[in-house]
Amino acid sequence: NDMAKDILNRVAFYVSVNDMLLRLQTFDDNGFTYRKDRGYAFEKQLNENTRGYLNRRLNEYYLPEYNSEIPMLIINPTIVNNGKRLIISPQPISYLSYNRNQKNIKNDYLTESIEFKRFFKNQGADDLQFTSALRMSSTFPYVMPIVHLPSDPEFKVMDAGLRDNFGVKNSIKFLYTFKKWIEENTSGVVFIQIRDSQKKQKIDK
């Protein structure tokens, strides 16, 4: 119920009284100063709705995930500049970043995605707010502002749905990477998909 509480009213308020005018209000976080916008409003309302349970840094989830106390979570917004996926996780996950080379073509592994924690390690990637990662992955055009990341050239990040709306790509790559372990230690894998709309029916021939 907490996750379903209203967020858009505060976001709409910020659009009308802040984002459409000069953004003069600022806030400090971990030694840096940022301007308040509707993205800030989204995170603030989300934290209030969820009673602060999600108000954590990325690195705070590392040990609980590593010790299997909580499920491993992978967030992958889309980099607008080049269409690649930005993979965010407390764990090292470079194995999700590459496409294997083709057997009939001599070429190197292709970097299909960028691992956030490795790429931005000198910019404090571990200190990323978890709600900021969620917001990057749900940045729908006009509703929330594009996220700008400190790279050169600057990465612009938007909704994960631009590339992989249901996380199928990550799931398949994860399954393929650990297929031997899964075969030896489990009875199988179950995929659970949570959709925001009904699945389209197949068209009869």
Regions found by a protein language model. Give the residues of each.
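Catalytic domains of lipid- and phosphate-ester/thioester hydrolases
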Residues: N1-K205
